[in-house]
Amino acid sequence: IIIIGSPLRKYYGGAFSYSVDYSTSYIKRMKLLLNMFKENELKSIIYRSGWNFGININDHFSIYKNLHISKREDVSHAFQLIANSKISIINYNSTTWLQLAYINFPFLLFLDKKYDLTTDLNRDILELMEKNKILFYDSKKLYHHLIGLDNKILKWWQTEDIQKTIKEIKYIFNNKFDTKEFVKSF
């Protein structure tokens, strides 16, 4: 399992970044999720931190001794980590989940309703993703779904409902960016 983490800021970074109070909320939300995992389960998880904009995730996640942390500053792209995982959890609204949908790679999206807004442009697809248990806003529901998948991730991912959802994501979003470089990593 790889968790793709959000860049966290101590300062406001402009129109395309989350507000400063997002970082505190994000860390709290992630700890709620990570606290549910048993120590032996954490051994199979890599947390991929976003850029360090004044907040070092190691300062907050060092309590999880068995959690592997990969820093964005050390390796700029997480593609190889994703390719070596069975499933990715993307915990902020980035293009990663769109790229994974494009190549049909299993992922779960873990968003925060306060910061990741639903609009007329994304409401229908987000509701469909939530209905089909690809999108979660609650850490407990996400954890139980993930544990329930056990080693049947691909079986779940290939179900008709999931594949219809992925096709819908591709139809709505994936013609918006060039994924050729991303696909080469797999």
What does each of the following model-derived ranges do?
Residues 83-91:
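Acidic donor-binding loop of glycosyltransferase active sites
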Residues 54-57, 78, 96-98:
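Short, well-ordered alpha-helical microsegments
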Residues 62-65, 92-173:
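Catalytic binding pocket for nucleotide-activated donors in carbohydrate/polymer assembly enzymes
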Residues 171-186:
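C-terminal alpha-helical cap of glycosyltransferases
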Residues 80-82, 128:
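Structural alpha-helical scaffold elements that stabilize or flank donor/cofactor-binding regions
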Residues 1-59:
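Conserved catalytic-core segment of nucleotide-activated headgroup transferases in glycan assembly
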Residues 56-74:
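Nucleotide-activated donor-binding/catalytic signature segment of Leloir-type glycosyltransferases, i.e.
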Residues 2, 32, 37-38, 89-90, ...:
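Hydrophobic transmembrane helix bundles of membrane-integrated enzymes that assemble
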